[in-house]
């Protein structure tokens, strides 16, 4: 389990990147970390991987502190958004380095993945395209057989075939080895396909986190036609009207919403599920984030 408890991090004298952040990734989960630009997602990830030390609060993996703990760090596979950390080495040189640094490096898996990624192992990574560098990063990281796979915008710039191949490999590790995955991405539709838990961050703190199924069961889109007032008990996040048809985004489980709307005797009442992208937009809209005029 990955746990951040009441974590605060300030850079300089005024910039508070994390503000009492609490985040929990259950063991064996595929957790999608999403948020507005500048929400603090990458800063949170750099605490999880032991790069940053928190000002206050705690950061633990498996109940153990991460910062300056090589035993815990050796169980983490991390792919950052910026791959400049690879420098000018070749894949072959980096694989040899990983073997010395990570006791769990699996040479057989590294060899097996050669047919998946098909990269020249004698070419310096700086000569690879951005997409090829991502391929190399996944090749090396998946060869670690990590207990915890932490990914920051991992498939940005990859073609659809390779994206699907990489997610398939990662999910095989989740199913076969109990790997815990945390992935930060702005591609919410893709996250919806692979994640079972979601956390939404804004301005350094967590707005909400829960399983994806629970999250989607607590928001509903309604299209209705009624001549009667709507019940005051409805928790309306957004509403719009086109002709006689009202479209409402509501917080609440579908059955409760349907029962409440029945009191207004609607002539038409269709309840529709919300996508993760829609939930993200309307949840942030409630914080004052400038998304109030977006309608999906």
Segments (PLM) and residue ranges:
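Helix-to-loop junction immediately C-terminal to a conserved catalytic motif
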Residues: 49
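ABC transporter nucleotide-binding domain
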Residues: 166-254
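ABC-family P-loop ATPase nucleotide-binding domains
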Residues: 80-136
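Catalytic Walker B motif of ABC-type/P-loop ATPase nucleotide-binding domains
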Residues: 149-153
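Short, charged/small-residue-rich alpha-helical element at the C-terminal edge
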Residues: 220-296
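Conserved ABC transporter NBD signature motif
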Residues: 57-72
């Amino acid at each position: 389990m990955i746990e951040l408890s009441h974590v605060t991090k300030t850079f300089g004298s005024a910039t508070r990147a994390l503000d009492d952040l609490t985040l929990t990734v259950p063991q064996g989960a595929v957790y999608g970390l999403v948020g507005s630009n500048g929400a603090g997602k990458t800063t949170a990830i750099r605490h999880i991987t032991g790069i940053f030390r928190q000002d206050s609060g705690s950061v633990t993996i498996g109940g153990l502190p991460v910062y300056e703990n090589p035993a815990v760090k050796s169980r983490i596979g991390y792919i950052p958004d910026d791959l400049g950390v690879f420098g000018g080495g070749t894949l072959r040189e980096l694989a040899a380095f990983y073997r010395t640094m990570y006791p769990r490096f699996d040479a057989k898996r590294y060899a097996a993945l050669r047919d998946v990624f098909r990269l020249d192992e004698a070419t310096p990574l700086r000569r690879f395209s951005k997409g090829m560098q991502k391929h190399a990063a996944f090749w090396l990281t998946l060869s670690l057989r990590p207990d915890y796979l932490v990914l920051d915008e991992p498939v940005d710039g990859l073609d659809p075939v390779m994206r699907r191949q990489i997610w398939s490999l990662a999910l095989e590790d989740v199913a076969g080895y109990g790997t815990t995955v945390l992935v930060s991405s702005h591609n919410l539709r893709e996250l919806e396909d692979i994640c079972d838990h979601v956390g939404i961050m804004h301005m350094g703190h967590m707005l909400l986190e829960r399983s994806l199924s629970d999250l989607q069961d607590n928001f509903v889109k309604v299209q209705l036609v009624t001549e009667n007032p709507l019940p005051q008990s409805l928790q309306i996040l957004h509403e719009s009207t086109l002709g006689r048809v009202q479209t409402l985004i509501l917080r609440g489980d579908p059955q409760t919403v349907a029962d409440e709307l029945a009191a207004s005797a609607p002539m038409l009442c269709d309840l529709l599920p919300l996508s993760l992208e829609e939930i993200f937009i309307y949840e942030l809209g409630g914080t004052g984030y400038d998304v109030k005029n977006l309608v999906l």
